[in-house]
Amino acid sequence: LFRSSAASDVYKRQANVLSHLEYYLQLVWPELNVNVVSSTEQWAGAAIAGPKSRDVLQKLFPDLDVSNEGLPFMGYMEGNLFGVNAKIFRISFSGELAYEVNVESDNGNFMWEKIIEIGKEFNIQPYGTEALSTLRIEMGHVAGSELDGRTIPYDNSLEGLVSKKKDFIGKRSLSKTAYIAPDRQRVVGVVPLDKKTSIPEGSYIVKDAKAKLPNPKL
């Protein structure tokens, strides 16, 4: 999860964490004086990734120090994108140097056009969420569609991160029957036999690919 602090008492969190925060505020810590609100539709975002991403970002924000020291990994700053206020995050979903730029949704098209215009010098190429998902998997991130409320650290070889002594959020869940049953569903990786075939997202695994419909999935 990524968090940036733009003020001492204001935090912005990305990814699908709103439902978790609402759950804990209602049932676990109802005494806390904290409000959460979704601002997703108020912002437009673009990821700039690759070995030349810092060069592109510097031309987009010439007045900012976006060097490794000025904007370290997981860093955050605000800037002016040709008259438009922008929020800049250094975060990578691809394993390469990458940034994410957010502007108010009304300025989304303007931001996109500027990124493409400035990026031409560096042979920039647009890529979509399908490509991003592939890059994210290659990076090693396990999130999104791979995880749900039934997934535990032991499913992903992350048992070394689970403390046996200290308390932590979710520790109680690890002792529930549903999470320790030997026949429980688990998240696993699927690799094609020829190592080349790309398995589309959302594909079904069936016992006999040539069987007539309906063909039950495994």
Kindly label every feature range from the protein language model.
Residues L1-A7, Y11:
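Single conserved hydrophobic/aromatic residue that forms the stacking wall/gate
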